[in-house]
Amino acid sequence: MIEQMTIEQLLEAYPEGTAEGFAGYCDELSAWQLIVDVTTKLLDDGCWVMVDGQQKTVDISPACIAINGSGFTLVSLPDCHDDAFDAPEIVNNQQAAPEKSAVWALAATVFRMVMGCNIMNGRGGKAQKATSKLPFMRNEMPVLSRLVQQCLDYDVTKRPSLDEVLAAAKENLERCREEMKDGPRMKPETASSTSATQADSAAWPEEMIPAQN
């Protein structure tokens, strides 16, 4: 079970703060590392936290993920809940497996880390319906984007398990590391921008295309 800590304890243990500080600037390697670290924590400690003597589902969002050196760790903080990261079954008070709701929240977190905005036009799970088009993040991150889509499926039974997410993340984290050793696959002048506001709009549902300044 994940233990709750105060903000002061968080900053003492993890002086670099939380992942929220670089939401929108997360590259593919860091995204896979975040998935590996958070899923490992959930599998080791469970999807629960003890608050005031009561067991509750742990919150997952960029503000609840501490930067731990070159990696990340999931923490539980008071007043850290953000309903944009609540899976639709949580919003609708439907009975569901906590693990599958955690998978959804983790995918919504990764989407925000990479794109700099929340899914469903910023409204998260409360706006998702069975007929909602699943968001696609980046054309240059097809494997990561597909995994996020699978994890955000409205149908709980169609989402992968934490074990499946971890296995995919480990494989692709290693792939990214090897690609970094081999050098960039695209010339700098032809590489796609990493800015969320310059993402290929064709990959977005219409309501999620970011405004151009």
Give the positions of each predicted feature.
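Conserved C-terminal C-lobe helix
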Residues: 139-152
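Terminal C-lobe "cap" of eukaryotic-type protein kinase domains
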Residues: 154-160, 164-179
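Regulatory extensions appended to serine/threonine kinase catalytic cores
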Residues: 177-213
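Catalytic-loop of the protein kinase fold
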Residues: 42-68
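Activation segment of protein kinase catalytic domains, centered on the conserved DFG
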Residues: 14-37
